[in-house]
């Protein structure tokens, strides 16, 4: 018997959408409510039941990493609650019934892998009378395996959470409801069939087109802590699946979720014939932290400071600031009524904690006649910011003389004066230095093997000729990798774009010890708020050349602007020092903005010419959480068409920047960054400059910390 179809007019849709209009909130008691069922992940990742999403969201900052197995498919997903009203999910799908390719020499017997991205937006937050209402787009930037759009609602009633939604595309193939948008335009009545082989392109022309179906379900939180049950009625008929037409004996799916600590374990029965299971790990990037073993800030009550500046034990002051305040001094001036300390905070990434600890040391070891402490922090021997501490106000704070005193009330941040810049004479401005750190390069979804990695040591060495000029180098030593599985270098086809990045495999599969970078750099302050640098040498793994940059960055401003220009040549992957014939001029005008309407975010827009001489814009969006973790995404849009670009359609990627002190028991500065670029082609590629002024001037208007 054919499934019943239901008419769904535009007027009905309009009445449903009216629930999302703020003016309907007429009763003051109609406030957001809480619900007893904790949202859990669906099979493909993202908050939902089993195969269908719900309108629910995780708490802001929540991150869920999931693995699920459902016979024909395996899913590995990461879901992130960027804002209270926005969820984003990235997913890899392993299609067990399909090969990656039919060329055994290229991908062997590896099964087909696919990448997908989902987003969901909350339109209305649940209140006493009204449900959560959300709209979402699944697999909107991939090859379309699970491409679909949906609108749904969720309402909690005691231990139950009810969900009802409308789906298009993969969520609507049951076609049991008439698509109301057909009344607007005939093109909405049909949805293009098949899957996109190129991927990476947003098929917005497919949105809300074609068949439409109802889906929904219920969750029940049992009296047993951590155990909940989920039942759903789904809208897919499984006849257009990438794994092939799958048998569906029932539209009902059932299962249970058991939560233990930060883990969710799930077991489900789907389609009336398939058993699946999964596990999710959750953490919150706002609240994640690490216990610290550290001495408390110095108590100054009862301590008698020196009578005058001449009585200050400078060597003890140097040592105490470094050992107990994390502040390394490079120059020092003590006058009758003020003291200036040029240096760098190397331990406490929390600004207030650093000021608190340093201020207590200064208050105990400097005479009371000194009324101001100036902490002039420098970057690459260029003074960047002057933290001016009012000594009397700070003493009142540190001795608890003022109730509910806040350290922020004791200091202000200003730009260093020209007099301070001219007076700066750093100790040990010249000399050699050496450091070593681990590197870990990884890539997912490759034809040779799903996961490829390279682990090793990056040894940095340099020599400073003076406070402005230095030579720097990096040597990579590979300790462990499986990059030898790479079997593709350059195909025989004539490429539309120069091979500026697609030859990367030739660069990473060379000798165990390689020369990564060697370059000279000059950097200085041009004027108040203006900074510049020039550099030349082997600038990155694949390119060398010369370049320069200038940046405008006011103190504690939401806005910064910079321009860089570079002439580069491509390095020869078969030689340590030689270059190839290809050369290019590349550079950008970049604007950085931290909007007040999106707290803890930064947007960068860079307009210019890329390595392959294509022109356009690169946009980067970053979100910082309370723990200091930063999550970002970027994309390049150029005058190269998606067909000319190739697989992926355009350059895009994601990254996570994690503070070092989340992993260790001691306070520390420094970060590790983990990038993910789904497809790296030649269009929209920027030069990986070894030093960028946005990083050098970070303390001028901190975003990362």
Outline where the language-model segments fall:
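N-proximal, solvent-exposed amphipathic alpha-helical segments enriched in charged/polar residues
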Residues: 288-335
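Transmembrane beta-barrel domains of Gram-negative outer membranes and organellar outer membranes
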Residues: 26-145, 157-158, 170, 202, ...
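Outer-envelope beta-barrel architecture signal
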Residues: 59-63, 74, 84-86, 129-133, ...
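Outer-membrane beta-barrel translocator/channel fold
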Residues: 90-118, 122, 136-140, 145-148, ...
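Residues on the lipid-exposed face of transmembrane beta-strands in outer-membrane beta-barrel proteins
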Residues: 65, 76-80, 117-121, 151-155, ...
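Membrane-embedded beta-strand positions of outer-membrane beta-barrel proteins
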Residues: 63-67, 78, 88-90, 119, ...
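Polar/charged, Gly/Pro-rich intrinsically disordered segments
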Residues: 298-304, 320-328, 370-433, 441, ...
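Outer-membrane beta-barrel proteins
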Residues: 82-84, 120-127, 157-159, 222-224, ...
């Amino acid at each position: 018997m054919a499934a019943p179809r239901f008419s769904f007019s535009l007027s009905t849709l309009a009445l449903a959408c009216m629930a999302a209009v703020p003016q309907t909130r007429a009763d003051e008691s109609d406030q957001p409510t809480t619900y007893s069922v904790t949202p859990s992940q669906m099979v493909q990742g993202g908050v939902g039941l089993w195969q269908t999403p719900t309108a629910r969201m995780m708490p802001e900052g929540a991150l869920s990493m999931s693995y699920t197995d459902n016979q024909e498919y395996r899913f590995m997903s990461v879901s992130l609650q960027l804002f209270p009203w926005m969820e984003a999910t990235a997913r890899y799908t392993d299609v067990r019934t399909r090969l990656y390719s039919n060329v055994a020499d290229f991908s062997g017997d590896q099964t087909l892998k696919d990448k997908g991205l989902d987003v969901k937006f909350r339109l209305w937050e649940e209140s006493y009378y009204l449900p959560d209402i959300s709209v979402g787009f699944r697999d909107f930037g991939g090859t379309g395996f699970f491409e679909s759009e949906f609108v749904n609602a969720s309402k909690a009633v005691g231990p139950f959470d009810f969900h009802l939604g409308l789906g298009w595309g993969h969520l609507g193939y049951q076609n049991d409801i008439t698509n109301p948008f057909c009344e607007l335009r005939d093109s909405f009545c049909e949805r293009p069939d098949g899957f996109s082989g190129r991927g990476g392109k947003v098929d917005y022309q497919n949105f809300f087109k074609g068949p439409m179906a109802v889906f929904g379900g219920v969750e029940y939180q049992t009296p047993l802590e951590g155990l909940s049950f989920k039942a759903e009625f789904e809208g897919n008929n499984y006849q257009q699946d990438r794994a092939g037409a799958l048998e569906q004996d029932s539209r009902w799916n059932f299962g249970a979720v058991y939560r233990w600590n930060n883990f969710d374990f799930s077991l489900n029965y789907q389609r009336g014939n398939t058993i699946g299971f999964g596990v999710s790990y959750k953490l919150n990037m706002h609240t994640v932290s690490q216990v610290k073993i550290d001495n408390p800030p110095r108590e100054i009550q009862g301590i008698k400071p020196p009578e005058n500046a001449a009585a200050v034990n400078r060597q003890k002051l140097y040592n105490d600031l470094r050992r107990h305040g994390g502040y390394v001094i490079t120059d020092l001036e003590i006058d009758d009524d003020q003291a200036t300390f040029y240096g760098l905070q190397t331990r406490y990434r929390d600004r207030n904690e650093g000021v608190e600890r340093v201020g207590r040391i200064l208050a105990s070891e400097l005479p009371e006649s000194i009324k101001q402490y100036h902490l002039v922090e420098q970057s690459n021997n260029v003074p960047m910011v002057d933290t001016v501490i009012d000594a009397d106000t700070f003493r009142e704070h540190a001795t608890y003389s003022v109730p509910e005193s806040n350290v922020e009330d004791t200091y202000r941040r200003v730009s260093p004066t020209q007099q301070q810049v001219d007076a700066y004479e750093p100790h040990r401005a010249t000399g050699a230095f050496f450091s070593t750190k681990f590197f870990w390069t990884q890539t997912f979804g490759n034809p040779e093997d799903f996961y490829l990695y390279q682990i090793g040591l990056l040894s940095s060495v340099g020599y400073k000729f003076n406070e402005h000029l230095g030579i720097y180098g990096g040597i990579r030593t590979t300790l462990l990798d499986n990059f030898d599985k790479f079997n593709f270098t350059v195909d025989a086809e004539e490429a539309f774009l120069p091979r500026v990045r697609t030859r990367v495999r030739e660069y990473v599969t060379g000798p165990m010890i390689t020369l990564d970078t060697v370059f000279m750099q000059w950097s200085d302050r041009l004027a108040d708020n203006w900074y510049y640098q020039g550099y030349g040498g082997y600038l990155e793994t694949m390119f060398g050349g010369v370049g320069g940059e200038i940046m405008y960055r006011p103190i504690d401003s939401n806005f910064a602007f910079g321009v860089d220009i570079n002439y580069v040549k491509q390095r020869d992957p078969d030689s340590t020092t030689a270059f190839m014939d290809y050369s290019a001029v590349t550079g950008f005008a970049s604007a950085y903005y931290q909007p007040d309407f999106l707290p803890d975010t930064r947007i960068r827009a860079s307009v210019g010419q890329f390595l392959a001489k294509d022109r356009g814009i690169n946009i980067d969006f970053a979100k910082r959480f309370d723990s200091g973790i930063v999550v970002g995404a970027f994309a390049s849009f150029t005058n190269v068409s998606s067909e000319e670009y190739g697989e992926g359609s355009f350059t895009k990627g994601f990254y996570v920047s994690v503070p070092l002190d989340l992993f260790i028991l001691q306070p520390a500065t420094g970060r590790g960054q983990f990038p993910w670029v789904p497809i790296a082609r030649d269009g929209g590629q920027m030069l990986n400059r070894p030093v960028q002024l946005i990083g050098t001037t970070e303390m001028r208007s901190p975003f990362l910390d």
